[in-house]
Curated annotation (Swiss-Prot):
This is Probable cell division control protein 7 homolog 1. It catalyses: L-seryl-[protein] + ATP = O-phospho-L-seryl-[protein] + ADP + H(+); L-threonyl-[protein] + ATP = O-phospho-L-threonyl-[protein] + ADP + H(+). Keywords: ATP-binding, Cell cycle, Cell division, Kinase, Magnesium, Meiosis, Metal-binding, Mitosis, Nucleotide-binding, Serine/threonine-protein kinase, Transferase. ATP binds at residues 27-35, 50. It comes from the Eukaryota. The lineage of its organism: Eukaryota, Fungi, Fungi incertae sedis, Microsporidia, Unikaryonidae. Serine/threonine-protein kinase. Needed for the initiation of DNA synthesis during mitosis as well as for synaptonemal complex formation and commitment to recombination during meiosis. GO terms for biological process: cell division; meiotic cell cycle; regulation of cell cycle. InterPro entries: CK2_alpha (IPR045216), Kinase-like_dom_sf (IPR011009), Prot_kinase_dom (IPR000719), Protein_kinase_ATP_BS (IPR017441), Ser/Thr_kinase_AS (IPR008271). Belongs to the protein kinase superfamily. Ser/Thr protein kinase family. CDC7 subfamily. The active site is at 137 (proton acceptor). It holds the Pfam family Pkinase. Gene3D superfamilies: Phosphorylase Kinase, domain 1, Transferase(Phosphotransferase) domain 1. GO terms for molecular function: ATP binding; metal ion binding; protein serine kinase activity; protein serine/threonine kinase activity.
Length: 351
C-alpha cells in the first residue's frame, strides 16, 4: 500500500483524536475519506484512522457504522474499534492491516495464492450477504490481502445497503419492459470502433448506481431498480478475471454506456440480447467489434496470460460468477463449496 507523509494541514480534521492516537502516515484516500496509519498511545498497537470528509451524508456515515457493528469484525470483515465525532468531523478507528499491493500480487500469484485470495474474499462476502447486506463497491482496493499470512480483510462499507432497501421490480424472466428502451451503441474506450447509438428522449430510468467503473454488474449498468447481493458476485468475478489475465484494470470504460459495450465485446450480441430481455431492456448495436457469439474466457485468459494455470474447475467458477443474469449467478455460499477450492479446504483441515 502506498504511504504518504502527513502535512500539518492534513492533521486539522483529526486533531481532536491526537491525544489518544498519533498519526504516522497517510495510507489511503477516497472520495469521502482519508485513512492514516496511527499509533494507539494506550495499547502501543498500530491502528487505522478513517477521517470521513465533511461532504459525506450524515445518514451514510451512520449506516456505515451500523453495518460494521452488525458484521462485528468477523469472517474477514474489518472490525470497528471506535468512532469519534467533533462537530461535523468524524473519525473511525480500525485495526491496522498490512496488505500487499494488488498489482504486485497478481504479477507473481500462483494457483494456490489465487485460491486463498478468492476464498478469503468469498468468506467475507458470504458473511455480508447472510446479514442481508450488499457491499456494492467490491474492488481490489476494498479487499486488503496479506500474502504472507494468507488472510484478507474486506473494508469500506460506505456504499453498502440492506437488500430490502433497493425495492421495486425489474422485468426479470421475460416480462414486459419496465421503462424506456435503452440502446447501447457507443464506442469502447480502448478500441474506438465505429458505431451508432439511439437516444431515447424520455426520462431515463432511476436506479441505484453504486460501485466503481469496471466492476459494476450488468443489472447496475442496465439500471434495474431491484438489485441483490448478486451485484457483489459479479464484482468478485471481475477481480478473478483480472487476476487470471494480470490486466488491471481489466475494463477501462469511462462511463456506463461504454461499460455495457465493453462487456458486449466479450459476451457477444446473442447473450446481450438475452440479458437485456431478462432485465426488461432492448439491446441493439452495429458496432463491428462486438461478435455475434461470446468469446470464451479460456481464449481471453490464454491470450493475455499464456502461463495461467487454472483448470476446468477454475473456469467453471469464473463462468458462474460472470453470469449476465443475476438470478442464475452463483452465490457466495455456493462458490465456497465449489470444487475449485476442494484441495484448499483439504489442506486447511489437515493443518
Amino acid at each position: 500500500m502506498e504511504e504518504e507523509k502527513i502535512l500539518e494541514s492534513d492533521l486539522r480534521h483529526i486533531s481532536f483524536v491526537m491525544p489518544k492516537y498519533t498519526p504516522i502516515e497517510k495510507i489511503g484516500e477516497g472520495s469521502f475519506s482519508v485513512v492514516y496509519k496511527a499509533l494507539d498511545a494506550e495499547s502501543g498497537r498500530y491502528v487505522a484512522l478513517k477521517a470521513i470528509t465533511r461532504t459525506s451524508s450524515p445518514a451514510r456515515v451512520l449506516d456505515e457504522m451500523m453495518f460494521l457493528k452488525t458484521l462485528g469484525g468477523r469472517k474477514n470483515c474489518m472490525g470497528l474499534l471506535g468512532c469519534f465525532r467533533n462537530e461535523d468531523q468524524v473519525v473511525a478507528v480500525f485495526p491496522y492491516f498490512e496488505p500487499i499491493d494488488f498489482r504486485e500480487f497478481i504479477s507473481n500469484a500462483n494457483l494456490a495464492d489465487i485460491k486463498r485470495y478468492l476464498h478469503n474474499l468469498l468468506i467475507a462476502i458470504e458473511h455480508v450477504h447472510s446479514n442481508g447486506i450488499m457491499h456494492r463497491d467490491l474492488k481490489p482496493g476494498n479487499f486488503l490481502y496479506n500474502k504472507e499470512s494468507g488472510r484478507g480483510m474486506l473494508i469500506d462499507f460506505g456504499l453498502a445497503q440492506y437488500e430490502e432497501y433497493s425495492e421495486g421490480q425489474h422485468a426479470e424472466g421475460g416480462a414486459k419492459p419496465a421503462g424506456p428502451l435503452l440502446f447501447f451503441n457507443s464506442v469502447v474506450s480502448k478500441t474506438k470502433p465505429p458505431g451508432y447509438y439511439e437516444r431515447d428522449g424520455r426520462p431515463p430510468m432511476k436506479a441505484p448506481r453504486a460501485g466503481t467503473r469496471g466492476f459494476r454488474a450488468p443489472e447496475v449498468l442496465f439500471r434495474c431498480q431491484r438489485q441483490t447481493g448478486a451485484i457483489d458476485m459479479w464484482s468478485v468475478g471481475v477481480i478473478f478475471l483480472t487476476i487470471l489475465t494480470t490486466q488491471y484494470p481489466f475494463f477501462y470504460s469511462s462511463d456506463d454506456i461504454d461499460s455495457i459495450v465493453e462487456i458486449a465485446t466479450i459476451f457477444g450480441h446473442a447473450e446481450m440480447r438475452k440479458a437485456a430481455k431478462f432485465y426488461g431492456r432492448v439491446w441493439r448495436s452495429n458496432i463491428d467489434s462486438i461478435p455475434e457469439e461470446r468469446i470464451p474466457f479460456e481464449t481471453i485468459v490464454e491470450s493475455l496470460n499464456p502461463w495461467a494455470e487454472i483448470g476446468s474447475d477454475g473456469y467453471d467458477l469464473l463462468y458462474r460468477m460472470l453470469d449476465l443474469c443475476s438470478s442464475s449467478r452463483i452465490t457466495a455460499s455456493d462458490a465456497l463449496s465449489h470444487p475449485f477450492f476442494d484441495d484448499l479446504k483439504t489442506h486447511e483441515n489437515c493443518a
